[in-house]
Amino acid sequence: MYNYVEQGLITIKNYDLPEKLKRNTKLHHVRKNKKKLGRSIEERPKEIDQRNEFGHWECDLVLGHKTKDDQVLLTLSERMSREFLIIKIPDKTAASVMNAFKNLRKQYSEHWNDIFKTITTDNGSEFADLANLEEVSKTLVYYAHPYTSCDKGTVERHNGLIRRFIPKGDCINNYSLQQIIDIETWCNSLPRKILAYHTPDEIFERELDKIYQTA
C-alpha cells in the first residue's frame, strides 16, 4: 500500500497511514580511539572526587564561530571553590594553550604548586602539551576518558554559563577582553547553594589567604 501511495495510485497521503517506516540511509562512522596523551584520570587519587582539598582544576576550551581566524576561550574551574577562569587565546593550538598556562604560572609565581596541584582535561590535541607542566612544576595532569565530558563536569557546567552571554556560533572575536572579564566576574560572584551560599570568589580568596600566610 505504501508503494501505491508513493506512486500516486491511491489518493491518500503518507501521513494518513498509521505508520511509515523510515530507513536511515546515512553512513555511520565508527569513532576511532583517541591517542592517549598522558596520565589517565583512572590514576587520579579518589580523594579529589570529594572536593575537600583546594587546588584541583578542570580545563576545557569554548569555541565560537569555529573558523581558523576566530579566537577561543580557555576555561579552568577549581573543583572545591568553583572558581572559574576564562582566558582569551588566539586559537585552539597546543602552543596557544601552553602560552596561556605560561602566563598563568607567572601570575601565581612561587605559589603555583599549591594553587594548581592537579589539572584534569580531555584528550584533544590542543591539550597534547599540557603534561609538560609536570616537567617545570609539581602539577599533575590527568586526561579524561575519550568522549566522556562528565569526567570534567565542573568546567563543562561553567562553560554553560558562558553561553548565556556568548551563544553557540557567535564569533569570540566580537567580544572584547573587558566583556570576557565581566562574564568571569559574574560567574565568580554568583552565590552557590552547594557553597552554603558563598560565592566562588569568597572561597577562592579564603584558600589563597591560607596559602600566602603559610608561605
Model regions and ranges:
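An active-site-proximal beta-strand-loop segment
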Residues: 43-84
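Acidic/histidine-rich, metal-coordinating catalytic segments
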Residues: 113-129
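Active-site beta-loop-alpha junctions of metal-dependent nucleic acid enzymes
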Residues: 65, 69, 86-110
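Basic, flexible linker segments flanking DNA-binding modules
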Residues: 2-50
